[in-house]
Amino acid sequence: MSTTTSTTITEADENAIRDLVALAQESQSDTEALMALHTAETAIVNLAGRRVLGRETYAKAMADALASPLSDVLTTVEIVDVRLATRDVAIVSCTKTVHDRRSGVDVSTELPSTGALTYVTTRSHGGWRVALAQTTPILTPTNDD
């Protein structure tokens, strides 16, 4: 008797996960809608390396950011790959692009505008939710030789 399970993603699951990522992007300025897409235990590591643990803490961090000039910083996400780790856990590899529309900010001294974003999503009774989002900056080589 085999105890292994298939980790081949179905078209329906992949579409649901892609929809989740798209909805997260669309909801980035709506804290309530964004939080509904995350598990209660979610962990977030942003482009700057700030770690936020738990949906309540994440909601406060997002509300604070949206009440500041950071509300003029939006991101877009392009999915590179979706794969199952287990039947109910998927790893989503993305490229995140930051669009900083704040005035008076010297973007040359800011963080890179592109990052490698990895989501870990989990399936629950309510569908797929984000359990972890981690973004690693993608550094652009400089010509300072």
Predicted feature descriptions by range:
Residues V98-E110, L139:
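Short, cysteine-centered beta-strand-loop-beta hairpins and adjacent loop/turn segments enriched
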Residues M1-A40, T142-D145:
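Short, low-complexity N-terminal intrinsically disordered segments enriched in polar/charged residues
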Residues A43, S93-R101, T136:
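Generic short beta-strand segments
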Residues N15-A16, L20, D88-A90, T95:
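Terminus-proximal functional modules
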Residues V82-I91, T121-R129:
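A short, structured loop/turn motif at beta-sheet edges
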Residues S2, P112-D144:
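Short beta-strand edge/turn micro-motifs at domain boundaries
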Residues E14, T31-D88, L111:
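A solvent-exposed, acidic/Ser-Thr-rich amphipathic alpha-helical stretch
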Residues Y58, M62, V77-R83, K96-V98, ...:
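Hydrophobic/aromatic beta-strand elements that line small-molecule binding cavities or substrate pockets
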